[in-house]
Amino acid sequence: MNPYILWLGSIFDQKMVMSSKAISPAANNWQLGLITPLCEKGLKTLVLERGRMVKHIEDYPTMNLDPWDVKYGGRTTQEELKNYNKQKRWGIHEGNRHFYNKDSEYDYDEIKPFDWIRGTQVGGRSLIWGRQTYRWSDDDFEANLRDGIAVDWPVRYKEIAPWYSYVEKFIGVSGEALNLPQLPDSEFLPPMELNCVEKELQSSIAKNYTDRVLTIGRVAHITEGTKNGSGRKACQYRNRCDRGCPYGAYFSSNPS
């Protein structure tokens, strides 16, 4: 009989239990990429989310509103922000605050500065993450050993690289391949285009330096084609990502 895979709590905050043994999962967007092959191989899989249901498109109430149609021009009042005294560090506004926990209801102790940005709902933080997606390099995996601090990583980049590729193909990552040892290339979709000022700066840096590079951010956005069977389509560059994307262009668990 196939074992059951049970995911407890919010998919971006909690732990996976398999055959009664707790396993710490990979963080953020990687988790669905790890669950998917288990499902595809026939394992009976149960995902439990803590919080309200958020259905793709149906529960993105501000996704198509123009700035002048959003209450208070999109700004959140100082009185309302008192409910988000920690979450507001990330970028709360009237177009997206329905995806964030109220600190007045879900507060946490903060002895030292610690930004715990949370969304208690189906999709969790996949609806509010910044989508910047980068591989660690040998420099990162070997840093502790090289600097003589903390604990050496038990794995190296070459061991993780195939799994980076697997997840990147699943979520869709756009970016520019540069063959930089300190920033390994991903399985890229076409990069987003720089604007004219950025292109001028990029050109100037290239002319004057051999050890510096300017490139577009590497983000979990589909920039070309679609993800078959997932309901996800290419980015429309609307700059309304944080309200929920009706095209599913950026990776979240909801359309996937």
Enumerate the language-model features and the residues they cover:
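Conserved redox-cofactor binding core of oxidoreductases
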Residues: 71-100, 105-115, 120-121, 129-135, ...
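Glycine-rich FAD pyrophosphate-binding loop
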Residues: 39-61
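Short coil-to-helix leader/linker segments, especially the first N-terminal amphipathic alpha-helix
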Residues: 1-9, 94-101
